[in-house]
């Protein structure tokens, strides 16, 4: 998609972080932006930020509360959105959560919630909108993570959900080409968002050591990289150099990647007196 001017963009998780940054970036490109999230007050505050970036008085903006993990609610909200704002040219599935901890500390309810928000949520919104979008084509971006192509200590549930997103997106890209719908998957690194700071409250020391070796990106940097990747219709959009390198090495030299990660983990555990 070369031009976002006058395009209708739906963004889940659009009230903060990468979703909000992307909404603002699209606003500066002349797009009509509709954001979705669970908290109405956060949505309304975000909407004012997005409107402030507009380049034309003809641009339309709105927000709608929605829990992406609730299939019935997604169907109902998306039906109303299409009736009010039209079929989206762009769907960006950005809603997600992470609550890092080691596998044995995760109960089933926590695992289920992570999968429902991160992966099922993408399936829900995509399923609700593809029947409309296939009539005229469009663009779908699903947000995964670097943890979607490399399993990380402390992220057994999160990595599982993000791996699923990549597989889903690659298969969907193949299926929807015939309808003129392009599908990309965004794999950002650690990004300076409210969610990232919440993660740090529960993140195991091993996880902090691994993630601390890479550059922390800003949401607007990720948003710029996303739009650039969409213009190229890239299959995988990986904003950081570190991420691109890991993506390549994981495929060519997986043993080396595992060795480096294991070495980092062992150093942290040795400091605690573990063997």
Can you say where each PLM-predicted feature lies in the sequence?
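The beta1-alpha1 cofactor-binding region of Rossmann-like NAD(H)/NADP(H)-dependent oxidoreductases
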Residues: 65-76, 108
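Residue(s) in the substrate-gating loop at a strand-loop-helix junction
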Residues: 145
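Active-site helix of classical SDR
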Residues: 126, 161
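Conserved glycine-rich cofactor-binding loop
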Residues: 8, 15-17
């Amino acid at each position: 998609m070369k031009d976002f001017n006058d395009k209708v963009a739906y963004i889940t998780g659009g009230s903060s972080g990468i979703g909000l940054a992307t909404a603002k970036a699209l606003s500066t490109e002349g797009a009509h932006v509709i954001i979705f999230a669970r908290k109405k007050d956060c949505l309304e505050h975000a909407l004012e930020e997005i409107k402030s970036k507009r380049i034309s008085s003809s641009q339309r903006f709105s927000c709608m509360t929605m829990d992406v993990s609730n299939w019935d609610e997604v169907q109902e909200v998306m039906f109303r959105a299409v009736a009010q704002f039209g079929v989206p040219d762009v769907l960006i599935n950005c809603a997600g959560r992470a609550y890092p901890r080691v596998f044995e500390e995760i109960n089933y309810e926590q695992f289920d919630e992570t999968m429902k928000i991160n992966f099922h949520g993408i399936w829900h919104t995509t399923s609700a909108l593809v029947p409309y979008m296939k009539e005229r084509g469009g663009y779908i971006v699903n947000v995964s993570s670097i943890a979607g192509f490399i399993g990380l200590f402390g992220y057994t549930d999160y990595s599982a959900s993000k791996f699923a997103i990549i597989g889903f997106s690659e298969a969907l890209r193949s299926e929807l080409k015939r309808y003129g719908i392009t599908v990309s998957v965004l794999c950002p690194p650690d990004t300076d968002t409210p969610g990232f700071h919440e993660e740090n409250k529960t993140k195991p020391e091993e996880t902090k050591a691994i993630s601390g070796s890479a550059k922390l990106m800003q949401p607007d940097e990720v948003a710029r990289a996303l739009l650039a990747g969409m213009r190229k219709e890239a299959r995988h959009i990986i904003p950081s150099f570190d991420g691109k390198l890991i993506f390549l090495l994981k495929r060519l030299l997986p043993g080396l990647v595992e060795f480096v990660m294991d070495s980092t983990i062992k150093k942290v555990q040795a400091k605690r007196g573990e063997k």
